[in-house]
Amino acid sequence: MKLLFPILLLTGSYFLSACNNTQSLMSSTHTIAASDPHIQVMGRTHINDDASLTFGYPGVSLSTIVAGSRLTAEMQSSNGNSWIDVIIDNHPPTSIKLDAQQQTVELFHFPNSGEHRVEIIHRSENWHGQVTLKQLTLTGTQFLPAPVLPQRKILVLGDSVTCGEAIDRVAGEDKNTRWWNARESYGMLTAKALDAQVQLVCWGGRGLIRSWNGKTDDANLPDFYQFTLGDTGQAPQWDHHRYQPDLIISAIGTNDFSPGIPDRATYINTYTRFVRTLLDNHPQATIVLTEGAILNGDKKAALVSYIGETRQQLHSNRVFYASSSHHPGDNSDAHPTKDQHAAMARELTPQLRQIMDW
């Protein structure tokens, strides 16, 4: 009986110590660089010397799974005009505008620790600014193995429509970068329907041979296809071995035809050379050419004809055509609306299923 009190005291001390250790473990912090393998990346990114990631194309997505109560990200936008969507456990997204200076973005904060899946999606496009993700910091137990991407791979090449411009338009509001929403674009919706990962490589206002205003000295599709981000001679060049798509969709031509129907031979010869580059760089890929959603009437008919002759010149059983209906936007903006993007995906998906036998 004399030993009972010391034993109980020792036992109580043990449980108190264990409880404190558990609380300490649950409240500890863990920081990983953006290029850490616990973060799954979809889209073109540039790995910097400090292991951070910089990206500019829309739809770039970074996802991770963690056990903890709070997760933050150190991020910035070079121009302060970029937006991201943050999705926690498949709940509706939260849209966040990034500053030009590095900021701490709180991705989630819960009273209790638990397992959570987190996804960051770049809503904006290159000319809004390049986004840098430096690191993630977790309050909790650990970063778990990263989510696995679908095996099928799609590359979508295009202009502002592919970038998701004006999907989130607001009637009566001056147009701003909040209106872009790559997540709801036809390309990402189509990839989701086909159970595929996707890269959007697109630039608003650009075309195959000229921009919307007729300029020919901008970086148009054959140029910016080669970039990781940016559109100047100093832009990091993309290593095509990093991503070998099964399917490439080229939806270009709206801006080429905006000033008028371009010279037939110039357009077809340029498109033929570019598609040959795609065939060489991606020897296992099927390539689908489409006219996009904005053109109508004579311009649409001319572009469809140019695409047909491009295919004839290539003589390749890997190059196909997919048709697109006219989706004219609304009174707020000529770009397709959110509902029209969904309709575009519904139109495109069965054509691609048949071509790919998916």
From Swiss-Prot:
Residues 1-18 form the signal peptide. Pfam families: CE2_N (PF17996), Lipase_GDSL_2 (PF13472). Gene3D superfamilies: Galactose-binding domain-like, SGNH hydrolase. It catalyses: Deacetylation of xylans and xylo-oligosaccharides. The record marks G205, N255 as: Transition state stabilizer. A lipid is attached at C19 (N-palmitoyl cysteine). CDD domains: Endoglucanase_E_like (cd01831). It comes from the Bacteria. PROSITE patterns: PROKAR_LIPOPROTEIN. Pathway: Glycan degradation; xylan degradation. Its EC number is 3.1.1.-, 3.1.1.72. It is found in: Cell membrane. PANTHER family: ESTERASE, SGNH HYDROLASE-TYPE, GDSL-LIKE LIPASE/ACYLHYDROLASE DOMAIN PROTEIN (AFU_ORTHOLOGUE AFUA_2G00620). The active site is at S160, D333, H335. It is a lipid-anchor. This is Acetylxylan esterase / glucomannan deacetylase. Belongs to the carbohydrate esterase 2 (CE2) family. GO terms for molecular function: acetylxylan esterase activity; hydrolase activity, acting on glycosyl bonds. Keywords: Carbohydrate metabolism, Cell membrane, Glycosidase, Hydrolase, Lipoprotein, Membrane, Palmitate, Polysaccharide degradation, Signal. One of its GO terms (cellular component) is plasma membrane. The keyword Chloroplast does not apply. It is an enzyme of class 3 (hydrolase). The keyword Nucleotide-binding does not apply. One of its GO terms (biological process) is xylan catabolic process.
